[in-house]
A protein has these predicted regions:
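A structural signal for isolated positions on well-ordered beta-strands in alpha/beta enzyme cores
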Residues: 37, 287, 353, 381-383, ...
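A conserved beta-strand->alpha-helix junction
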Residues: 59, 131-134, 310-321, 416-436
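Secondary-structure transition/capping motifs at alpha-helix termini
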Residues: 143, 280-285, 304-311, 346-348, ...
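PRPP-dependent phosphoribosyltransferase catalytic core
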Residues: 155, 170-171, 196, 211-217, ...
Length: 467
C-alpha cells in the first residue's frame, strides 16, 4: 500500500481556509488523481470530507462552506492498491483524545508489519500505512499521551518515507522523516509585519497560488507546529546523516517544473539534464521533441546543446491524468493514445529525437513509439533524461518488484528492440547528479540499488536487507 501524494496544512484565523486548501490541493493535483480530501477543526470538532476523484470533483462550493474554520489539512492521493475504495482516501481520522485528530501522509513506510505486530494489530485490516500510523497514534493518545508525545513515540519507530500533516484541536503539525525523502515546505500568508497565517505543502507552487511567501523547506526529522499564535519548530526525530535524501525522481518527474527543491528550480534542472544528455550523444536528426510534460524542458536543453531544432510533435489532452501514476498497468498503456496525439505535419518524414523523463515498465514508451511511426516518423531516437530505473522504490513510487522494471531484466539493446525505437540512450548517473548540482543530497536507490534506509528487498525470491 504505497502512496506518493500531495499534502497541505493551513492555519489562518479569519480566512476561508477551506477555499485556500482547495486552491493549494489543485496546485498539487499532479501528485495524485485517485482521491482528494480535507479535514478542518471548528466548533470543537474535526470534520473530514474525502472521496475518489480529482479535487474539482470532490469539493463543491457547498462542501467548502461546510468546512469553515481556521485550521485545515488536505491531501491528494496516488496509490497502488485500494483505489476503488473511497475509505482509503485521506485524511485519516481517529476519535482519540478530546477532539480526535486527522492525518495526511506522503510517502511509504517499510516496516508496517513489524509495527502492527508489536502493537497487536492486524495490518491486513488497515487500509494503508497511513491508517496504521493513525491507529498507533490513537493507542498512545487513548493511553494518556499528548499528540506531540505520541508523534515522537510512533514516528521514531517508523522506517521509510513520510512527509505528514496532522490536525489536532487548534493545531496543525507538519513532520518530515529523518532522511527527507519527500518534499515539504513552509510558507507565510501576509507580510512579515502583518502575518495572516501559515501554510505547509508538498511543493512551493501550492504556496504561490495562495500568494504565500516561501519561507523554507522543513528539515529532515523536524516537526513544525502551527497555531493561531504562530509557528514553532522542534527536532522531533534525529536526522539520518548530515545530508538529506530527497527522492531524485522529484527532480526528474514528480515535482512541477515551477517548484523549487533544495534551492533549485525544477524546470532549470530538467533543461540542464537535456543539455548534458545531448553532450553524451553524436546524433544526426531533424527535430528534437519532448514527451509532455516532464520531457519538454529536457528536450529544450537537448536542442540547445545539440543544435538540432526543437519542435512540438505531440499534443497533450490536459484532461487525462499522468500515465506513470495511473493505478494499474493496463490503464497506463491504454491512456497513452487518449493522452497524446501526434502532430503529423511536424513528424512525417522526420528523424526525431524524442526526449522523455524515464522508462519504468516500458509499456507507455512502446505505445508512444508506435504512435510516432504511424504518424510517419522516419526515425525515432529515444533519449531519456534519467538513468535506467533498475531497482524498486520502497519510499513512495509505484515499483514494488524488480520483475516490473524493464531495465532490471533487459540490456539497453533488448529494451530498444522491445520498445521499437531506432536507438535508445539514457543520461549517465554522473550527468544527472551534475544537472541537479547537489552533492549527495538525493536518494537514487531506484537507479543504484543503494538504499539509504533499511528496507526489505526481494531478490530472486530471497528476502534480504539493504542498508
Amino acid at each position: 500500500m504505497k502512496e506518493a501524494c500531495g499534502v497541505v496544512g493551513i492555519v489562518a484565523p479569519g480566512r476561508d481556509v477551506a477555499h485556500l486548501c482547495y486552491d493549494a490541493l489543485y496546485a498539487l493535483q499532479h501528485r495524485g488523481q485517485e482521491s482528494a480530501g480535507m479535514a478542518t477543526f471548528v466548533n470543537e470538532q474535526i470534520t473530514v470530507v474525502k472521496d475518489n476523484g480529482l479535487v474539482s470533483h470532490v469539493f463543491s462550493d457547498t462542501t467548502l462552506q461546510a468546512l469553515a474554520g481556521s485550521f485545515v489539512i488536505g491531501h491528494t492521493r496516488y496509490s497502488t492498491s485500494g483505489s476503488a475504495n473511497w475509505t482509503a482516501a485521506q485524511p485519516v481520522y481517529r476519535s482519540a483524545g478530546i477532539s480526535g485528530f486527522a492525518l495526511a501522509h506522503n510517502g511509504n513506510l517499510t516496516n508496517t508489519h513489524e509495527l502492527a505486530e508489536l502493537a497487536g494489530i492486524s495490518f491486513t485490516k488497515m487500509l494503508s500505512d497511513s491508517d496504521l500510523v493513525a491507529e498507533l497514534l490513537a493507542l498512545d493518545v487513548n493511553a494518556g499521551a499528548s499528540l506531540r508525545v505520541a508523534l515522537r513515540d510512533v514516528l521514531s519507530r517508523c522506517e521509510g518515507a513520510f512527509s505528514m500533516v496532522i490536525l489536532d484541536a487548534n493545531e496543525v503539525h507538519a513532520v518530515r522523516d529523518p532522511y527527507g525523502f519527500r518534499p515539504l515546505c513552509l510558507g507565510r500568508l501576509g507580510t512579515a509585519d502583518a502575518v495572516e497565517g501559515w501554510v505547509v505543502a508538498s511543493e512551493s507552487p501550492a504556496l504561490d497560488v495562495l500568494g504565500a511567501t516561501f519561507v523554507r523547506e522543513i528539515a529532515p526529522g523536524e516537526m513544525v507546529t502551527i497555531t493561531s499564535q504562530g509557528v514553532t519548530s522542534s527536532q522531533l526525530l534525529t536526522p539520518a546523516g548530515d545530508r538529506e535524501k530527497l527522492c531524485i525522481f522529484e527532480f526528474v518527474y514528480f515535482a512541477r517544473p515551477d517548484a523549487y527543491l533544495l534551492g533549485h528550480q525544477v524546470h532549470t534542472t530538467r533543461r540542464r539534464m537535456g543539455e548534458l544528455l545531448a553532450q553524451q550523444s553524436n546524433l544526426d536528426a531533424d527535430l528534437v521533441m519532448g514527451v509532455p510534460d516532464s520531457g519538454v524542458p529536457a528536450a529544450e536543453g537537448y536542442a540547445k546543446a545539440s543544435g538540432i531544432p526543437f519542435g512540438y510533435g505531440l499534443v497533450k489532452n490536459r484532461y487525462i491524468g499522468r500515465t506513470f501514476i495511473s493505478p494499474d498497468q493496463d490503464r497506463r498503456a491504454a491512456s497513452v493514445r487518449r493522452k497524446l496525439n501526434p502532430l503529423r505535419e511536424n513528424i512525417e518524414g522526420q528523424r526525431l529525437v524524442v526526449v522523455d523523463d524515464s522508462i519504468v515498465r516500458g509499456t507507455t514508451t512502446q505505445a508512444l513509439v508506435g504512435m510516432l511511426r504511424d504518424a510517419g516518423a522516419a526515425k525515432v531516437h529515444l533519449r531519456i533524461s534519467s538513468p535506467p530505473f533498475m531497482w524498486p522504490c520502497y519510499y513512495g513510487i509505484d515499483t514494488p518488484t524488480r520483475a516490473e522494471l524493464l531495465a532490471a531484466n533487459h540490456t539497453i539493446d533488448e529494451m530498444n528492440k522491445f520498445i521499437g525505437s531506432d536507438s535508445l540512450e539514457f543520461i549517465s548517473l554522473e550527468n544527472l547528479r551534475a544537472a541537479i548540482d547537489l552533492d549527495g543530497e538525493c536518494c537514487d536507490a531506484c537507479l543504484t540499488g543503494h538504499y539509504p534506509a533499511p528496507t526489505p528487498v526481494a531478490l530472486g525470491g530471497v528476502v534480504t536487507s539493504r542498508w
